[in-house]
Amino acid sequence: MASICGRLGVGTSEAFRSLFTRPGNKLARVVNSAKGVDKLAKTAKSAAELTASILEHTEGTGTDSFVTASKVAKGLGDARTVIALGNAFNGSLPATVQSARSCFAHLQAARKPEEKRPNVLMKEVCVTHGRRAAADACAMIGGVTYLTTFGAIRPVLFVNKLLAKPFLSSQAKNGLGSSVGYIMAANHAASVVGAGLNISAERADCDERCKRILNGEADEVLGANNDLGKESVRQREIAGEKSRSLTRIKYSILTMIEKFLECVADLFKLVPLPITQGIRAIVAAGCTLSAAIIGLCTFWSKA
């Protein structure tokens, strides 16, 4: 995680330098991506909401600073509704379909015996594919809930807000608005579980790949000709495999932390706790902002 943060700091300074010298710099890649713009809007909106919550608790709702922060938060919320609509159908929809296909493929593979490697126990094969199927199922739940929120409910509420004569009754509007919180709570919970399953699956898969390399199953691909060369190439390949796997695990850990913070925010938003509404709003906004920053940094590091 420290290495990712270190690379992020170096990458940020380089990105701002290249902003004026290279058209295809990292900042341009982030901004040109619907997902990147969505994360930028989410971070800015969360910062405005936290500011408004703190000002409301300390100074009240009548100050100019609170009114400004509230308007900024609402404006960024509307902007994110528009941005996320494109992200929902351009990125989330195909990813959800792919997760569903992968889930069913792993479920089918878990029921079939391993033909090429009879030494592998059937139980191990079932566990491996079952773990991946569960992770894909969590990704599918996350995709469906995201599509429901940002591909259907939020756009409907936004259009209803723009019309001179809204087509939704107050009761329907409040019901849809309340449902968003619970749907996204399911999204965040599924993402936490899915990230944990991905970490477990990645560790197991990495161990399996390293064992295959040690057993010589990849010698033809690696191109080793003698025993000493084989051993050297195997060790380098194992080191590279572990390094790549560790990077994927780090990103999964960051995703888990991000979504866990959003789960904490959901807890303070949706569950009646024995603390004042102002403190609940501040804690929820702080957790959401922290999660948004982690998500933006992770996306930046991958871009």
Question: Which stretches of residues belong to each language-model region?
Answer:
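Glycine-rich, hydrophobic membrane-spanning regions of integral membrane proteins that mediate transport
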Residues: 1-303
